[in-house]
Amino acid sequence: MIKNIFKPFNNNLNSLLPIRFHNVSLKLDNNFFFKKLSFEINTKGISVFIGANGAGKTSCIKLLTGLIKPDSGEVLFSTNKEILNLIGYVPQKIILLRRSVEKNLLHTLSISNYPTNKKKQRVKEILKFAKLEHVAKQSARNLSIGQQQLVSIMRALAIRPSFLFLDEPCANLDPQTTQIIENLIKTVSKAGVKIIIVTHDVFQAKRLANDILFFHNGKIIEHTKTKNFFKNPKSKEAKDFQKGLLLK
């Protein structure tokens, strides 16, 4: 195993303030979806946003990445611009360039601040760790869905980010590939990367999460340790969700 290949460039996450939403409001289709949403997450471990489809999980991730801006309120998780530039994001829809796997990884490094003289070596490390060396020269879009998703995640990790945001990382994947990706997520977390995952899969949340944020209709109904959420949910909505009554 290659040591420390996922260790963030700035590994001093202990010095960072918690991730904070302060009175965040967001309009979708001219209607308020989030209304004065406030919460706080620490910068260690794996946090999981869970809830039914359309509950607000993906919108929250997009606010964190800066892909969308709030209509009011603040999204704060660092005043350090170097940290903000080291965010890895994998959207639910796989988006790969019409290039080889190798060139997909190089492209991400080319638009980052990664040291120029270390980019090719970084690609070799990533390919070796992910066991993708045999497909390095193949078009990324010609791979299986599972391999494409693995390339997407490794591409996000190529820059050695401090934060990794994953939106439904195992959707539509077979059990074997799901296990590979979940093991990768655990390895990356142990290296010191803060990970936030969006999912509606309660079993995946149980396996991975240190803490759970349960979304329902644009609100965070519960935010607690994983064990507490599944053993003793406080709200009717959380209980119904765990019974499979709020999946749609």
Give, region by region, the residue ranges found by the protein language model.
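Catalytic Walker B motif of ABC-type/P-loop ATPase nucleotide-binding domains
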Residues: L164-D167
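Helix-to-loop junction immediately C-terminal to a conserved catalytic motif
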Residues: T65
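Conserved ABC ATPase "signature" region
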Residues: K118-V135
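The feature captures the beta-strand-to-loop junction immediately N-terminal to the Walker
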Residues: I50-A52
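H-loop/switch region of ABC-family ATPase nucleotide-binding domains
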Residues: T199-H200
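Conserved ABC ATPase signature
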Residues: S139-L143, Q147
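Helix N-cap at the start of a conserved alpha-helix in ABC-type nucleotide-binding domains
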Residues: P175-T177
